[in-house]
């Protein structure tokens, strides 16, 4: 069994305590076993769709999908894949807003298993420590690599950063296109969904909140 890093355990425990963890079963199967079983079930699904799996183009598709699910687009279900985090003492006493904009993300709608394609803006006001900027992107990507709803994804990113940085002063906004809306159902090709989660001063201070929302508006503009 893989031993989780301290940071991964802290984030997982914080999400569980707040009821924000992705719904997961307790049983954890070995990755190779999961890939084998997923491939078997995908073979059955494709056969029920009347696809000919003896065709060269389709023969390996169940195995490709299984590998993609376990190792790539759903890798964020396994905290062993939580990014290595570098937290640095705030020796410079930075106390102004730090913002990372235009963080690209691709996730999967947990209702229809189709794409959520979006961008995130993340801000925080440092307290005792700061985080390597690329780590913010990696945390966004980790939680995006799960079956998701956008509301939970936004809150998971915020709570993870609050936990790691030791401050409530974190804000996250995600603007995304949902292919469950674009490619099926109503087939609206132009609508986007924006979800914002605010913590600490971003929620209690009107000036801080407006500064963050201006950063989001600047990106959207």
Curated annotation (Swiss-Prot):
Its EC number is 3.5.4.16. GO terms for biological process: one-carbon metabolic process; tetrahydrobiopterin biosynthetic process; tetrahydrofolate biosynthetic process. Zn(2+) binds at residues 109, 112, 180. Toroid-shaped homodecamer, composed of two pentamers of five dimers. The keyword Zinc applies. InterPro entries: GTP-CH-I_C/QueF, GTP-CH-I_N, GTP_CycHdrlase_I, GTP_CycHdrlase_I_CS, GTP_CycHdrlase_I_dom. It holds the Pfam family GTP_cyclohydroI. GO terms for molecular function: GTP binding; GTP cyclohydrolase I activity; zinc ion binding. The keyword Chloroplast does not apply. Pathway: Cofactor biosynthesis; 7,8-dihydroneopterin triphosphate biosynthesis; 7,8-dihydroneopterin triphosphate from GTP: step 1/1. Keywords: GTP-binding, Hydrolase, Metal-binding, Nucleotide-binding, One-carbon metabolism, Zinc. Gene3D superfamilies: 1.10.286.10, 3.30.1130.10. Coiled coil: none annotated. SUPFAM superfamilies: Tetrahydrobiopterin biosynthesis enzymes-like. This is GTP cyclohydrolase 1. It catalyses: GTP + H2O = 7,8-dihydroneopterin 3'-triphosphate + formate + H(+). Belongs to the GTP cyclohydrolase I family. It is an enzyme of class 3 (hydrolase). One of its GO terms (cellular component) is cytoplasm. PROSITE patterns: GTP_CYCLOHYDROL_1_1, GTP_CYCLOHYDROL_1_2.
């Amino acid at each position: 069994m893989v031993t989780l890093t301290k940071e991964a355990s802290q984030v997982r425990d914080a999400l569980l305590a707040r009821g924000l963890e992705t719904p997961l079963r307790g049983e954890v199967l070995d990755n190779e076993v999961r890939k084998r079983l997923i491939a078997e079930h995908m073979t059955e699904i494709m056969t029920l769709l009347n696809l000919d799996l003896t065709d060269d183009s389709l023969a390996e598709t169940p195995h490709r999908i299984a590998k993609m699910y376990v190792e790539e687009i759903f890798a964020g279900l396994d905290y062993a894949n939580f990014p290595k985090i570098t937290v640095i003492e705030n020796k410079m006493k930075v106390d102004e807003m730090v913002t990372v904009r235009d963080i690209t993300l691709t996730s999967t709608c947990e209702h229809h298993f189709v794409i959520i394609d979006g961008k995130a803006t993340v801000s925080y006001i440092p307290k005792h420590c700061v985080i390597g900027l690329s780590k913010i992107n990696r945390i966004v990507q980790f939680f995006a690599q799960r079956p998701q709803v956008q509301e939970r994804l936004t809150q998971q990113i915020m709570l993870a950063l609050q936990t790691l940085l030791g401050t409530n002063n974190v804000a996250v906004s995600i603007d995304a296109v949902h292919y469950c809306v674009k490619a099926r159902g109503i087939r609206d090709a132009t609508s986007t969904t924006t979800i914002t989660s605010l913590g600490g001063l971003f929620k209690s201070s009107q000036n801080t909140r407006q500064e963050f929302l201006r950063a989001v508006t600047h990106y959207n503009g």
